[in-house]
Amino acid sequence: MHQSGPAGLSGLCRVTDHLYLSNGRAANDPSQLTRGQITCIVNVTETKSSCPPPPGVEEYIHIPVSDSPVSPLRDHFDQVADKVQHTAERGGRTLVHCNAGVSRSAALCMAYLLKHRGVTLLEAHGWVKTCRPMVRPNNGFWEQLIGYEMELRGCNSVRMVPSSMGQIPDIYEEEAKNMMPL
């Protein structure tokens, strides 16, 4: 189905041949961007980088969304998914990053896989988690992804369920049973 490249906490993680995921530190490291042959950067943090992109990066898109369950990340699913696809069709590579490379950027990579790779949300999560094991979109982004999957596929592979910590995606249900509420 896919090949992935885990890169640890600080590197670029290859989701597909044309889509990479990282944290802000890696996204601002010119040597990593050059090595990864990144041509487009999607920055999903509240602040725009003050560093100019290195040679080879032709496009820089800033989407100032906070990592809050009420942030409207869904408003950007199609824009980012289509940009990744368009860049891939031109032979380029897109890096999607947020501060930690865990929630916002992971959710956008999952949205791309849903829309352009035809996988379910459950499969998209597994795919991205294989590439970057620490991914965990916040619950609000999960709700938005679930709605997006319903819009694209007419059914859902993940659902929100009640837990001692509030509503969570069912894929975290077993994990949540072992946690104590604060």
Where would I find each of the regions flagged by the language model?
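Short polar/charged helix/loop
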Residues: 27-28, 46-54, 58-90
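Residue-level preference for the first positions of well-ordered beta-strands
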Residues: 19, 93-95
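Glycine-rich nucleophile elbow surrounding the catalytic serine of serine-hydrolase chemistry
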Residues: 102-108
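Beta-strand elements of modular eukaryotic interaction domains
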Residues: 9-12, 30-33, 51, 84-86, ...
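Glycine-rich, flexible N-terminal cofactor/catalytic loop recognition
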Residues: 11-50
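PTP/DSP superfamily signal
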Residues: 2-8, 78-93, 108-182
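Intrinsically disordered, low-complexity PEST-like regions enriched in Ser/Thr and acidic residues
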Residues: 1-11, 59-62
